[in-house]
């Protein structure tokens, strides 16, 4: 159907977000996704919106559904909608951008992006001896599958179980400390103070899974309730993904919104939707403490908006670990002393696997509706500070279509890389510690995992099970130390 001029004199093809919904019931993930979508449709209002949905996209989760978008579409009364399954490793901003582009081009009228997790539901059933059986979809395949292009880490990292995000982000945060010239004690206090401020925000979030205010000193101190995971991180520095949480957004054009009678006070406009599909592992990054790809996105967004991102009034930065927030603050030119969250972040609001961006967007949209003169920033982190994304939203249009782009080429042009040694045993010789973390045996430091710059100009992963060295690396700066590397292990030179 062709729509006439849009309300407010806008091009009728202008995309707009009209509904957000969340769910946190004790139910399997597909039920949460259906509930969140139904809530988003009800939030939008209007006539016949559910039946007009022609596109449903879901980011892959930890569940086993082959086509969850089809389950959602059928349940809301949109059996003809095209189902999209988007693999882990593609920024969640990309799902939103794709839907916006389809609406702008006329390929879609009403799109839903929805995702969710129910790890707590499964855990509680297993603990009580009940089965956690998911809805089966025998013989069902999605209409469209978006597959990631390449993994975010090197084979040598996978082979030696260095895929654990807490270890990789801990190494990034330690690199930030060295780049900033902080002491180990100053650094731990700084990142714990940031997380304490996030926790204070979570108290005001009725949907926070672990909403409570905690002190920075408690966060910084390992204890049985806050056990050490990977130096400098303890449990409550980490995202908490054992939650039951789902979120959905409904997008359409202003022409469709007007035709269906969706009240304009529900409308929130995308100003910017940017991502980079470039993938470079932590091991191969010349500058581990920075994120040039996100810098490119931030500069591009600021130029389009005509104002620096530090002036955007509402922000929710992806917050799986303190390093993610700290590096993004620097990359986007935000106040390093700020508290860029309205939810309380992934440690306290909850971090449903591969879906926090949709939870963030729902929360930011609610703030923007209440404060229509403000702009809202939502960022995406895919992988290990691998593929960035960001969206800027406003309850007021600016008369232009949103800026939508994948800036992979631009990101690659400013990202310096280093060749990685292919195997743990693939280098013998001298080197310098570029970054590191320490893993634990219970409460005791047990192993140092180091990324080293080799004397022949490459990068390698090397390990030490010297417990005295591990303990020392938790109290003294270890980055910059000269080491002798051989057979996959190292010792101070």
Question: Predicted regions span which residues?
Answer:
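Internal, well-ordered alpha-helical segments in soluble enzyme and binding-protein domains
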Residues: 95, 168-172, 357-360
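Soluble or luminal CAZymes and related metallo-dependent hydrolases
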Residues: 32, 91, 356, 360
């Amino acid at each position: 159907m062709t729509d006439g001029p849009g309300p407010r004199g806008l091009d009728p093809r202008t995309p707009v977000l009209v509904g957000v919904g969340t769910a946190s019931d004790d139910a399997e993930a597909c039920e949460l996704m259906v509930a969140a979508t139904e809530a988003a449709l009800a939030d939008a209002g209007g006539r016949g919106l559910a039946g007009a949905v022609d596109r449903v996209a879901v980011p892959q989760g930890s569940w086993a559904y082959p086509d969850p978008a089809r389950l959602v579409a059928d349940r809301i009364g949109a059996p003809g909608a095209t189902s999209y399954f988007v693999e882990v490793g593609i920024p969640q901003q990309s799902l939103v951008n794709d839907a916006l582009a389809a609406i702008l081009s006329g390929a879609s009228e009403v799109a839903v992006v929805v995702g969710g997790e129910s790890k707590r539901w499964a855990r509680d059933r297993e603990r009580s001896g009940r089965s956690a059986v998911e809805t089966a979809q025998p013989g069902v395949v999605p209409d469209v599958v978006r597959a990631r292009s390449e993994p975010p880490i090197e084979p040598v990292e996978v082979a030696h179980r260095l895929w654990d995000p807490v270890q990789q982000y801990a190494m990034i945060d330690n690199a930030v400390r060295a780049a900033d010239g902080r002491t180990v004690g100053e650094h731990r206090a700084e990142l714990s103070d940031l997380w304490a401020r996030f926790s204070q925000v979570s108290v005001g979030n009725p949907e926070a899974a672990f909403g409570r205010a905690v002190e920075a000193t408690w966060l910084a101190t390992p204890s049985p309730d806050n056990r050490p995971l990977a130096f400098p991180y303890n449990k409550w520095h980490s995202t908490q993904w054992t939650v039951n949480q789902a979120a959905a957004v409904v997008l359409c054009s202003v022409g469709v919104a007007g035709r269906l009678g969706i009240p304009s006070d529900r409308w929130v406009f995308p100003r910017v939707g940017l991502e980079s599909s470039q993938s470079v592992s932590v091991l191969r990054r010349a500058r581990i403490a920075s994120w040039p790809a996100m810098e490119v996105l931030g500069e591009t967004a600021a130029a389009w908006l005509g104002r620096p991102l530090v002036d955007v009034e509402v922000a929710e930065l992806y917050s799986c670990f303190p390093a993610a927030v700290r590096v993004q603050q620097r990359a986007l030119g935000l106040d390093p002393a700020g508290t860029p969250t309205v939810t309380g972040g992934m440690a306290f609001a909850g971090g449903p696997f591969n879906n926090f961006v949709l939870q963030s967007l729902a929360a930011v949209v609610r703030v923007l509706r209440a404060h229509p003169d403000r702009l809202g920033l939502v960022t995406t982190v895919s992988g290990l500070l691998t593929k960035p994304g960001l969206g800027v939203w406003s309850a007021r249009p600016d008369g232009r279509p949103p800026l939508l782009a994948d800036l992979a080429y631009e990101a690659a042009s400013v990202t310096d890389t280093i060749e990685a040694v292919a195997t743990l045993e693939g280098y013998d010789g001298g080197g310098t510690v570029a970054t590191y973390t320490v893993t634990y045996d219970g409460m005791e430091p047990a192993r140092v995992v180091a990324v080293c710059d080799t004397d022949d100009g490459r990068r390698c992963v090397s390990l030490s099970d010297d417990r005295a060295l591990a303990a020392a690396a938790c109290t003294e700066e270890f980055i910059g130390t000269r080491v002798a590397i051989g057979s996959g292990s190292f010792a101070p030179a």
